[in-house]
């Protein structure tokens, strides 16, 4: 390998010139480009990598994260991969015709050069692109999310994965499938798309199109729902949302959004308290969430809802940990879809109750802790059911499906954390038969699985550590003794039985299974012992209808 030295000169009879005059041309141009560096640019490092790439005839050139404002005009002609992401580039030079993969994310590009004919992967998310050049037929994957693109060129038949989230697209491209076997997944979330072309139905049923958070007209939604509900439908799965796609980036100060939930005589003190939290992470989005929550069906129609929210906010003000958790949960729920906000409110109430249980609120009330655990178990099963339901739908807003099961079964399954009303149940695709089946499944699994689930539940472990320290310590000792003495042999036996001895991935999976079985055995024994003692004292029952 030839030595690398950014600062060496090329004498008239240098070794490089005797091999190829091309080296001298490249090196001279790169050295000149290096001398034009702006403050903060690492052009010396870039030139070092360029020369190394050329001398070694490498097919990869990585110039990412060097704070470069430009690239030299003459890149090594043999490269198939170019990574210039996370710089300050406003344009790219002519690209080598050999290039197959281009990574130029998180720059300031306003346009792209002509794309090489063999390009397979184009990753230019987080730039300032307003349009794209013609796309080569070889292109397989493309990420153009977080740009300013208003329209797309024709999509190559080979394109499998397209991410175009958060642009200014007003329409989808035409889709022509024919007998093409390619399974596609295209993301057009958070654009300005108001209608869907009929050509979308040309895609195969294994394909997925994501168009959430777009201002789709009610006519477009109804037409698509009618088409995709037909028994003869064989088109793609389409993910949408009832959000109109108009994201309101304006928000009022956190303290103002919070005090609006309180009676006037408390607002001054509340405002003073919450001013201290204005700069906490996700405070702005939490403020926006509170304003959106006030406009939900539950806020308008449910008696005592405002008082419930105010009481919850008081608890948040008293606990930095709970506030941090809640701000994070609410961070993605400020879209204008009302039911998304409602589902987030459900999750926030779950977060509160689980936090309270972990902090000791139910240490002396095992019956209440069991009831809470039972509700969390039921919600977990409903999420599994909703996830399975989503897979059966061709035109689906996942938020509406998840919320539908919680809302419509809130009374029958005694779900205290679930809102009792939702706005868009009609588009959820959840039927009365789905609800009956879900209720029966929850009750069946609860009867057979709840105690095992409860014995592994984190808040229950926190209670045991505080209130049954000796029993907990003994259980931990038994667990580690079993892991030390039996774990290796049990894993080996399992691998041998499946014919996977020596397989590292299988060993990790078998180890996790043995660990879970060990914990299940130890903690179930401890749980049965403690519950038998506590429930016999207060007359509570483990099984609950």
Swiss-Prot record:
Q: Does the keyword Secreted apply?
A: yes
What is the main EC category here? transferase
State a GO cellular component annotated for this protein: host cell cytosol
Report which reactions are catalysed by this protein.
S-ubiquitinyl-[E2 ubiquitin-conjugating enzyme]-L-cysteine + [acceptor protein]-L-lysine = [E2 ubiquitin-conjugating enzyme]-L-cysteine + N(6)-ubiquitinyl-[acceptor protein]-L-lysine
| Pfam family name, one | NEL
Under the heading InterPro entries, the entry gives:
LRR-bact_E3_ubiq_ligases (IPR051071), LRR_dom_sf (IPR032675), LRR_E3_ligase_N (IPR032674), NEL_dom (IPR029487)
**Domain of life (superkingdom):** Bacteria
Subcellular localization is given as: Secreted; Host cytoplasm; Host nucleus
Protein EC: 2.3.2.27
User: Which molecular function GO terms apply here?
Assistant: ubiquitin protein ligase activity; ubiquitin-protein transferase activity
Q: How is its activity regulated?
A: Exists in an autoinhibited state in the absence of substrate protein, due to interactions of the leucine-rich repeats with NEL domain. Is activated upon binding to a substrate protein.
From the UniProt entry, list the residue stretches annotated as the region Interaction with target proteins: 1-242
An example Gene Ontology biological process? protein K48-linked ubiquitination
Q: Enumerate the SUPFAM superfamilies for this protein.
A: L domain-like
The annotated region (E3 ubiquitin-protein ligase catalytic domain) lies at: 251-545
Task: Enumerate the spans annotated as NEL domain.
Answer: 253-545
Let me see what the UniProt entry remarks about domains.
The LRR (leucine-rich repeat) repeats are involved in substrate recognition with target proteins.
Q: State the family named in the UniProt similarity comment for this chain.
A: Belongs to the LRR-containing bacterial E3 ligase family.
Q: What is this protein called?
A: E3 ubiquitin-protein ligase ipaH9.8
Q: What is the lineage of its organism?
A: Bacteria, Pseudomonadati, Pseudomonadota, Gammaproteobacteria, Enterobacterales
């Amino acid at each position: 390998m030839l030595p690398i030295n950014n600062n060496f000169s090329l004498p008239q009879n240098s070794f490089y010139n005797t091999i190829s005059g091309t080296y001298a041309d490249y090196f001279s141009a790169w050295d000149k480009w290096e001398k034009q560096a702006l403050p903060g640019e690492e052009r010396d490092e870039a030139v070092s990598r360029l020369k190394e790439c050329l001398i070694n005839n490498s097919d990869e050139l990585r110039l990412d994260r060097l704070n470069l404002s430009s690239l030299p005009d003459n890149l090594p002609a043999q490269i198939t991969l170019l990574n210039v992401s996370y710089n300050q580039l406003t344009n790219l030079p002519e690209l080598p015709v050999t290039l197959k993969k281009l990574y130029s994310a998180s720059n300031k590009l306003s346009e792209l050069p002509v794309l090489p004919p063999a390009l397979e992967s184009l990753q230019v998310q987080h730039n300032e692109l307003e349009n794209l050049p013609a796309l080569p037929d070889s292109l397989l994957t493309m990420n153009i999310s977080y740009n300013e693109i208003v329209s797309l060129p024709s999509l190559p038949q080979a394109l499998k994965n397209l991410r175009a989230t958060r642009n200014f697209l007003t329409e989808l491209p035409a889709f022509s499938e024919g007998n093409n076997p390619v399974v596609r997944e295209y993301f057009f979330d958070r654009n300005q798309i108001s209608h869907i072309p009929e050509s979308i139905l040309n895609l195969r049923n294994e394909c997925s199109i994501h168009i959430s958070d777009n201002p789709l007209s009610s006519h477009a939604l109804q037409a698509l729902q009618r088409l995709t509900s037909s028994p003869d439908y064989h088109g793609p799965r389409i993910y949408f949302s009832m959000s109109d796609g108009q994201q309101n980036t304006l928000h009022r100060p956190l303290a103002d959004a919070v005090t609006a939930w309180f009676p006037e005589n408390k607002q001054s003190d509340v405002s003073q308290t919450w001013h201290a939290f204005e700069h906490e992470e996700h405070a702005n989005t939490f403020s926006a969430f509170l304003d959106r929550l006030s406009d939900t069906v539950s806020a308008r129609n449910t008696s005592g809802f405002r008082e419930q929210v105010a009481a919850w906010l008081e608890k948040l003000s008293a606990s930095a940990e709970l506030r941090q958790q809640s701000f994070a949960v609410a961070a993605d729920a400020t879209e204008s879809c009302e039911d998304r906000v409602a589902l987030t409110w459900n999750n926030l109430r779950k977060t509160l109750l689980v936090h309270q249980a972990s902090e000791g609120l139910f240490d002396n009330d095992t019956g209440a802790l069991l009831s809470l655990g039972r509700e969390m178990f039921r919600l977990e099963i409903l999420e599994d059911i909703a996830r399975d339901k989503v897979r059966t739908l061709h035109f689906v807003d996942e938020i509406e499906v998840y919320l539908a099961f919680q809302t419509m079964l809130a009374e029958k399954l005694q779900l205290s954390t679930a809102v009792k009303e939702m706005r868009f149940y009609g588009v959820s695709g959840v039927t009365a038969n789905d609800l009956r089946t879900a209720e029966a499944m929850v009750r069946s699994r609860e009867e057979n699985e709840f105690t095992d689930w409860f014995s592994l539940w984190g808040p229950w472990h926190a209670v045991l550590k505080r209130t049954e320290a000796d029993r907990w310590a003994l259980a931990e000792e038994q667990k580690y003794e079993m892991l030390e003495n039996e774990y290796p042999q049990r894993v080996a036996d399992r691998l041998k039985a499946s014919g996977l001895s020596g397989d590292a991935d299988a060993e990790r999976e078998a180890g996790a299974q043995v660990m879970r079985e060990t914990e299940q055995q130890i903690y179930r024994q401890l749980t049965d012992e403690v519950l038998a003692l506590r429930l016999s004292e207060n007359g509570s029952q483990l099984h609950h209808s």
